[in-house]
Regions:
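Solvent-exposed loop/turn segments at secondary-structure junctions
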Residues: 13-14, 126-129, 194-197, 222-224
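Conserved Lys-Pro-Asp/Glu-containing loop-to-beta segment of HAD-superfamily phosphomonoesterases
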Residues: 4-6, 172-201
Length: 231
């Protein structure tokens, strides 16, 4: 048993990164949805460029806008359309354009110094290789994130960095579940900018309410909001 498990997202939580995620909306017969650009505009989502692939036209959103897109799409009635994604720009972390969110990094460093505690990074980025609509590419996120954190004084080993390779919040929740069951922490502190990820972690309260205290903490522009405990 440990006292605390600290879980941090990377993009837009520990650091501001420059990466775009492509989204294409496809009709049941396989054609592009001609209304998708208007849907983006109506929801105040602004793509910075577009690219045509064999599966459709991809509209590329900055990572923080993609998090907003996820929340809107999850609650919208999309009918029989299907959204597909291009995460190629998230295959690695560029240290030249990545800026630390110093306030959250400070929390991470303090967490590292806590006795009988564990710190892990869980990111939606891909791990070793990634399938994209434009071909397979190698991913270096685990190594890149470890090197970036080391450069700012945070010694998180690669074995404590988990690129789950999916924007599905349940994938992050599954990593946290494994650590709860393995280490039986008294408290879990989960930091993320994405409300869907925070909601998925909060759902673990029902499963582990007699085992651990779970706190979901939203990060916005490098600032943390008050922790949301289990009900």
């Amino acid at each position: 048993m440990i006292d605390n498990l600290f879980v941090f997202d990377f993009d837009d939580t520990l650091a501001k990164t420059i990466a775009h995620i492509g989204v294409a909306r496809i009709l049941p017969q396989g054609d592009d949805d001609p209304l998708f650009p208007m849907w983006l505009k109506n929801n105040d989502l602004h793509h910075e460029f577009e690219r045509r692939g064999s599966e459709g036209i991809f509209y590329y959103l900055p990572s923080e806008e993609f998090a907003t897109y996820q929340k809107i799409a999850a609650s919208d009635e999309l009918g029989d359309t299907k959204d597909i994604f291009d995460f190629a720009e998230t295959a690695g972390v560029d240290p030249e354009t990545t800026q630390a969110h110093n306030g959250i990094v400070k929390i991470l460093k303090q967490a590292e110094s806590h006795p009988n505690s564990k710190v892990i990074i869980v990111t939606a980025r891909g791990g070793d290789s990634m399938e994209t609509p434009f071909g397979n590419i190698e991913a270096t996120n685990r190594e890149d994130i470890a090197e970036f954190l080391a450069s700012i004084g945070a010694a998180i080993e690669g074995s404590s960095i988990f690129p789950v390779g999916s924007s599905d919040p349940q994938h992050k929740a599954n990593v946290v579940k494994q650590y709860i069951e393995r280490l039986n922490p008294e408290n879990v502190y989960f930091y993320d900018d994405n409300e869907l990820n925070l909601a998925a972690i909060h759902e673990l309260c029902h499963e582990y309410q007699d085992v651990t205290n779970i706190f979901a903490i939203k990060v916005t522009n490098g600032k943390q909001s008050p922790a949301i405990p289990c009900d």
